[in-house]
């Protein structure tokens, strides 16, 4: 119903930062029946774990800044399509608008792509282990990670994804001030806004006025990197202690 009369349906799965998965196949099929184009932001899933075009989407969107490049040193995005006519219109719009990557930016992206698979594998393994540990910790009230069998979106994620990714979000049983202090007290994990790099990054999302009020005040979004998983856990414990969260 909501898509009637629309020109484009823009989806994101998993969502950021709640890590909710949607039934892409069913939604895309419904949009197609209405003649509505579909674009899917696939940044968190990455092309390794999910293929929106194979599910019928017209456009797959990626922030190349994130996992594809993977070193937090590039600003670049990509649109991918199987439709040659649509590609022609997108390419023309890009050319006329001047949004063309420079050779250095293209080289940085290519460099990152060469290690993309191994980086994603390690980050995902770390995320699975940390999500399991966090889910058993009394200082945490909720962990969102589709790889957990207890996660509300586990079955749906399994049906569309080849893996569960390297993003976790969790709610801390503490005040906003304590959660901010926790994020500021980590020594290995960086308190910053970006994600998808080799380094682990976290932040309290509601510190930004533009973040949705549906996001809990005490939610931490955690982009898990490729560091030693026990070093990461030790840093989390250090941050808990520094913020006096028990």
What does each of the following model-derived ranges do?
Residues 1-139:
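Conserved PLP-enzyme active-site core in the AAT-like
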Residues 90, 180-187, 235-240:
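Short amphipathic alpha-helices in soluble, non-transmembrane regions
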Residues 97-98, 185-196, 239-246:
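A common structural junction motif
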Residues 99, 142, 196-198, 203-205:
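Positively charged, small/polar-rich N-terminal and surface patches that mediate targeting and assembly
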Residues 109-118, 165-173, 220-225:
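Short, well-ordered beta-strand elements within core beta-sheets of diverse protein domains
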Residues 119, 200-246:
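PLP-dependent enzyme catalytic core of the Aspartate aminotransferase-like
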Residues 128-187, 206-214:
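Conserved small-domain helix->loop->beta segment predominantly found in fold-type I
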């Amino acid at each position: 119903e909501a898509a009637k009369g629309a020109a484009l349906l823009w989806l994101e799965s998993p969502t950021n930062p709640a890590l909710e998965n949607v039934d892409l196949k069913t939604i895309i099929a419904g949009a197609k029946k209405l003649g509505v184009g579909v674009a899917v932001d696939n940044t968190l899933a990455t092309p390794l774990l999910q293929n929106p075009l194979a599910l019928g989407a017209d456009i797959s969107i990626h922030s190349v800044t994130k996992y594809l490049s993977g070193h937090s040193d590039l600003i670049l995005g990509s649109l991918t399509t199987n439709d040659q006519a649509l590609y022609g219109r997108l390419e023309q719009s890009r050319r006329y608008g001047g949004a063309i990557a420079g050779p250095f930016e293209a080289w940085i992206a290519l460099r990152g792509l060469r290690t993309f698979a191994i980086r994603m594998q390690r980050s995902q393994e770390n995320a699975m282990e940390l999500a399991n540990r966090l889910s058993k910790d009394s200082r945490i009230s909720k962990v969102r990670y589709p790889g957990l069998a207890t996660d509300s979106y586990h079955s749906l994620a399994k049906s569309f994804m080849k893996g569960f990714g390297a993003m976790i979000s969790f709610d801390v049983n503490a005040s906003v001030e304590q959660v901010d202090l926790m994020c500021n007290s980590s020594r290995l994990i960086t308190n910053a806004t970006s994600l998808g790099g080799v380094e682990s990054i976290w932040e309290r999302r509601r510190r930004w006025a533009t973040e949705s009020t549906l996001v809990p005040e005490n939610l931490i979004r955690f982009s898990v990197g490729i560091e030693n998983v026990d070093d990461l856990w030790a840093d989390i414990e250090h941050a808990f202690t520094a913020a006096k969260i028990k």
